[in-house]
Amino acid sequence: MVGPFAARWRAGALAIVIVPVVVAVTRALVRGWGPIGDNGILVVRADDVLTRHHPLLGSWTSASIASGQAVHNPGPLYFDMIAAPVKLFGHSVGLALGVALVNVAAVVFAVLVAERVAGRTSMVAMAAAVVVVEWSVGSELLFDVWQPNALMLPGIAFMVATWAIAAGRLSFLPWVIGIGSLLVQTHLSYVYLVPLATISAIAIAVAGNRGANATMPWRRPLAGAAVVALFAWAQPLFEQFTSSGQGNITSLLDASNQDSQRLG
């Protein structure tokens, strides 16, 4: 049972990280905000979810320049996550609400995990750090679907989840795989960070347990992580093996090799 005093602290910490996003979205929509440029293309792809144009991949990536063929970010998870608000409320309101909901979920997750891993002081510190980020980037970035901006707060959630694993909380492994998959699929800039952070967190957890007599409970977290990974990557894998031409994963590897050869 959580006492009323602890509950008030938690409610306050959650409120201060949620309010900036809510205020930013509300103010923008009242002023008639709408997606333009790349954001307009991204919202159309979100609206395509569960239609005959359903996206199996992410958006076009500049890796296409190196490979000489159309290459996309690895997967459509972000489109899937914001599709419902876009379809229900339209391209302007729905897009802003969809991105805002993802960001709210990310910051709430970060704050609650910090409390679970290290207590109230950690929760308050995490909330303060998130608020600093939210206020420093500017209000419009808090509901911007352009990938480098849209993944900023989910990226924080991912790092908090890896910290939890490093602290021995293996039950967060499925969360790391799920959020990490979202990051990698949405923008290639995370393709090295996510595996490196995940492996490092697991290594730290194993090293920290060497002196303990109890065996770490790996079975259930690994099983959960495998299920999450299969679900998260089902669409890109389907595209890879059913594409009439070269699959996107192969194209990404080719583009990476060509970039390496040019740099060499």
Where in the sequence are the language-model features?
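Loop-to-helix entry region of an early transmembrane alpha helix in multi-pass inner-membrane enzymes
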Residues: 76-80, 88-105, 141-145
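Short hydrophobic/aromatic helix or loop-helix immediately within or flanking a transmembrane segment
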Residues: 41-49, 63-91
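Membrane-interface alpha helices of multi-pass inner-membrane proteins
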Residues: 159, 173-200, 228
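Transmembrane-lumen/periplasm boundary regions of multi-pass, lipid-linked membrane glycan transferases
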Residues: 45-48, 52, 209, 220-264
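Transmembrane-helix signature of polytopic, membrane-embedded enzymes
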Residues: 110-134
